[in-house]
From Swiss-Prot:
Its main location: cytoplasm. Belongs to the transaldolase family. Type 2 subfamily. It comes from the Bacteria. Pathway: Carbohydrate degradation; pentose phosphate pathway; D-glyceraldehyde 3-phosphate and beta-D-fructose 6-phosphate from D-ribose 5-phosphate and D-xylulose 5-phosphate (non-oxidative stage): step 2/3. It is an enzyme of class 2 (transferase). Transaldolase is important for the balance of metabolites in the pentose-phosphate pathway. It comes from Frankia casuarinae (strain DSM 45818 / CECT 9043 / HFP020203 / CcI3). One of its GO terms (biological process) is carbohydrate metabolic process. This is Transaldolase. The keyword Protein transport does not apply.
Length: 371
């Protein structure tokens, strides 16, 4: 009997879970997924935490203690999210040790309201790194223009980074440069960079959502034939750039000093369009040295009926370039698509963060009144 997730791992794709909750940790579900589904990493975001906290009473005791202490909402959010991430880091510590620090990572996002403020992002990254206090933590920083310098400085201070909200190829080039510059600065400061790690989270399904809406408006048969093809092509071309960037003398010098490459991570991998296969953003993005973070529904769908027939990125670069040329030919402005997606991405996380703050504030209020 085939085991698609095991086959995916054997193909060199690291399987991560895009979810975290205290319930998942306390019931042993995360440990089960690590043991039986080959999960070797976890990503989180404000939306995930807001859902977890609003739908469980497992946070009540900590919220009660925080309310008695008079902790403000911002500090309460840090304390609660850091506790879950710390516990998840402990669940995955064995994976981290066994993989030499490549996998076993858990990601915690900085306040997304700081996405355009480099210095405050760096300060928040340092605070979260200290608060969680686990070597297998990733601090998530968005790939905004301000975020790029924060990424460099965070890495330079010896803090591992998950660069999030990457949509476009040119911005991805800048992310790789920010990563390498951070390592170079860390090395120049005398830091050991062998344990310093990073992933670059390239968002996938949202590209199809935005492009397909525009293709529908164009309405021609040529345009409609391109629906559901932009996101995979975009990710494949990103991997092509990754291969080129990490085959340079600049990277060779860093690798000789013990640096690990910044792996591409495919994020936003749940299928939004019901006409597309529910595992398309896994099956079509298989290459060694990549990460695919999936919500549990996608993970279980792939376990049930996913297929691995070999690499699906590198042999299809030419096809990806052709898709981009066809999109341009029918009138899709890809630069505008990417700019729109980045703006929407930051705003969505800001909105989720505000909801998270409101949820925590309400719980603090009720916990405090019952004290």
């Amino acid at each position: 009997m085939s085991n698609p997730l095991s086959e995916l791992s054997a193909a060199g794709v690291a399987v991560w879970l895009d979810d975290i909750s205290r319930d998942r940790l306390r019931t042993g579900n995360l440990a089960h997924l690590v043991e039986n589904r080959g999960v070797v990493g976890v990503t989180s975001n404000p939306t995930i935490f807001q859902k977890a906290i609003s739908s469980s009473d497992l946070y009540d005791e900590q919220l009660h203690d925080l309310a008695i202490r008079g902790v403000d909402v911002g500090e309460a959010v840090r304390a609660i999210t850091a506790a879950d991430v710390r516990d998840a880091c402990d669940v995955l510590r064995g994976v981290y040790d066994a993989s030499g620090g490549v996998d076993g990572r858990v990601s915690l996002e900085v306040d997304p309201r700081l996405a355009h403020e480099a210095e405050r992002t760096l300060a928040e990254a340092r605070a979260l790194w200290w608060l969680v206090d686990r070597p297998n933590l990733f601090i998530k920083i968005p790939a905004t223009r301000a975020g790029l310098s924060a990424i460099t400085e965070t890495l330079a201070q010896g803090i591992s980074v998950n660069v999030t909200l990457i949509f476009g190829l040119d911005r991805y080039d800048a992310v790789i440069d920010a990563f390498m510059t951070g390592l170079e600065k860390a090395l120049a400061a005398g830091r050991d960079i062998t344990d310093l790690a990073s992933v670059a989270s390239f968002f996938v399904s949202r590209v199809d959502t935005e492009v397909d809406q525009r293709l529908e408006k164009i309405g021609t048969s040529e345009a409609k034939a391109l629906r559901g093809r932009a996101a995979v092509a975009n990710a494949r071309l990103a991997f092509e750039r990754y291969e080129k960037a990490f085959a340079t003398p600049r990277w060779a010098a860093l690798a000789a000093a013990g640096a690990k490459p910044q792996r591409p991570l495919w994020a936003s991998t749940s299928t939004k369009d019901p006409s597309l296969p529910d595992t398309i953003y896994v099956t079509e993005l298989i290459a060694p040295g990549t990460v695919n973070t999936m919500p549990e529904a996608t993970l279980e769908a792939f376990a049930d009926h996913g297929s691995v027939t070999g690499e699906t990125i590198r042999p299809r670069y030419e096809e990806a370039h052709e898709v981009f040329a066809q999109l341009t030919a029918v009138g899709i402005d890809l630069d505008d698509v990417i700019e729109t997606l980045e703006s929407q991405g930051v705003q969505k996380f800001e909105d989720s963060w505000t909801q998270l703050l409101d949820t925590i504030a309400a719980h603090l209020g009720s916990a405090g009144s019952s004290a």
